[in-house]
Amino acid sequence: WDIRPGVNSLDKRLQNAWAKHGFEFLRRYYTMRMSISSAPTIRHIQGVEIRSIDISNPDQVALWHKLHQNSFSKHFGFAPRELEKWRELVQDSAIDPNGVFFAFKNGEPVGFCQCNDEYVEDNRGFINLLGVTLENHGTGIGEALLQTGISYCISKGYDSVELNVDTGNESGALKLYEKVGFKAESSWIQLHRPSI
């Protein structure tokens, strides 16, 4: 296994301490936030329907697992997870049971958006996961799912919505989030020790 510590981008002292042990920069991540007051216009795509799912339904969780594994399979650090491990993660997280949405294209599931209750005490929504199957990247489905997640957070009465992003994500997620109105609030970097 590989140790990959995360460090706040502003914490040069801690970064230098890790560097003394041979650790180097690997990736940068942003926490992004957007103030929300009115629901965005959800992009309509011919043949695409977005609807909430029932996370207590084992078949829908299995489908979500399949979508996740496909959507993130080319992402940095991706490691396949077996369905049972996925079910455990779903059961043990702060998932808002009404805040998981699937996109269906011509009746076939092609993407998902998952909102969390993690920051409810701060009156802030959190979009924890957003994924679109590889063959549907660049079709606008990700933007429609993101807008659905934002609208859901507005319906909960939140003042803002937050998400995290790998700035090196090859899918163009950072560009999408900026386009929709998210701004970087903080940044952290992931370090690693190169093999000798």
Please provide the spans of the model-predicted regions.
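Short glycine/proline-centered loop/turn elements that form peptide/ligand docking sites
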Residues: 146, 169-173, 190-195
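A conserved beta-strand-loop-helix scaffold within acyl/acetyltransferase catalytic domains
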Residues: 75-132
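Acyl-donor-binding surface of acyltransferase catalytic domains
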Residues: 1-49, 187-193
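Conserved GNAT acetyl-CoA-binding A-motif
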Residues: 1-9, 153-165
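Residue-level recognition of the GNAT/N-acetyltransferase active site
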Residues: 8, 133, 137, 166
